[in-house]
A protein has these predicted regions:
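Structural motif corresponding to the intra-repeat A-B loop/turn of tetratricopeptide repeats
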Residues: 83, 113, 176, 210-212, ...
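Generic helix N-cap/helix-start motif at coil->alpha-helix transitions
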Residues: 65-73, 97-103, 158-166, 193-202, ...
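Alpha-helical repeat scaffolds
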Residues: 88-94, 118-128, 180-189, 214-228, ...
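Alpha-helical segment of the N-proximal tetratricopeptide repeat
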Residues: 49-96, 164-176, 181, 254
Length: 318
């Protein structure tokens, strides 16, 4: 069970949650007797996870006397996030910007609220001392994690640390259409961590969206994923991007072979991801005139989701 920080709120999740700060049922305020609140239909484990984080930031009277006011503001800001009171969280966190985690947490909140310019500024501030990002979270052993959607089919969890800030920063750049800045940061991360699949997936996602006709970038994606096998879901997502890069440089049959590799393993793969891979393969079969194979793939997609993309229209052409 994880409590995640993502650009939709703080929430509990057994699997990969959504993007942002999310929390499916807001944590209610503690009553005057300091008893745990009733937070609706969440499981006991979920309630315990969130309440534990909240309680860890409920400082004793003595702690409040000796605690720096900025640290107290940071604690109260994170508590406000747990309550989904982001306006109050912002007020507190703006009093705690001398702490790197004040800027980091505020940056994530701004990302959640679609205030991308402000998010980028706060994350850049936090990254001036990257080794300090997450110190407050570690000090109080908080279970919250950074969560970002990289593609429609793939999201990542990170503890509060420099990597979490960098990935959030890339997301802010992406939303601001500052794709050159996003790629520059991702390339720096790739140079430092050439085996990091999350970085490669994010880089491929942005490049394929904005530079599909750039052969140099397409070759870079292909070379970056050289010898990649379908060993995990992350590998499969990256192979989906690789197939698109192959098709963009005219190597459609190689793209089809790559998609066949993606579809060779279905266990622990989300249905929407598998549908997209099969749909793309069907489209490519149609592109090279292999109508029988195209019809088979597109019919398989239609059987599960008749409204998927333009699958109905494509089948009407066969």
């Amino acid at each position: 069970m994880k409590t995640t920080i993502s650009s939709k709120g703080i929430r509990h999740s057994l699997g990969i949650p959504g993007t942002g700060w999310s929390y499916q049922t807001p944590l209610k305020k503690w009553n005057d007797n300091n008893q745990a609140p009733n937070i609706g239909n969440n499981s006991q484990e979920q309630k315990n996870t969130t309440e534990n984080d909240y309680q860890k930031l409920e400082f004793s009277f003595l702690k409040k006397l000796i605690c720096p006011k900025e640290e107290m503001a940071l604690a109260q800001g994170i508590q406000a996030c747990l309550l989904q009171d982001y306006s109050e969280a912002e007020l507190y966190l703006n009093q705690a910007l001398c702490y790197v985690d004040g800027a980091f947490t505020l940056g994530v909140i701004y990302l959640n609220e679609g205030r991308y310019t402000e998010a980028e500024m706060q994350l850049a501030k936090a990254e001036q001392t990257p080794e300090s990002i997450g110190e407050f979270y570690r000090k109080y052993d908080l279970g919250m994690k950074m969560h970002i959607e990289i593609t429609p089919y793939y999201a990542v969890d990170y503890e509060a640390n420099a990597m979490a800030s960098y990935i959030a920063h890339v997301k802010a750049f992406q939303q601001l259409n500052r794709h050159a800045d996003a790629c520059r940061l991702l390339l720096a991360l790739y140079k430092a961590m050439p085996q990091n699949l999350d970085v490669m997936i994010f880089l491929a996602e942005i490049v394929l969206e904005k530079e599909p006709g750039n052969q140099q970038w397409m070759n870079a994606i292909i070379n970056m994923t050289n010898n990649l096998q379908n060993d995990s879901y992350a590998h499969a997502v990256l192979l989906l991007s690789k197939a698109e890069a192959f098709d963009n440089i005219g190597m459609t049959e190689v793209a089809i072979t790559t998609l066949t590799s993606v579809l060779s393993k279905k266990k622990d793969r989300p249905l929407d991801f598998l549908l997209e891979a099969q749909y793309q393969r069907g489209v490519l079969f149609l592109k090279i005139g292999k109508k029988t194979q195209a019809k088979k793939d597109l019919n398989a997609v239609f059987a599960i989701n008749p409204g998927y993309a333009n699958v109905n229209q494509l089948l009407g052409q066969l």
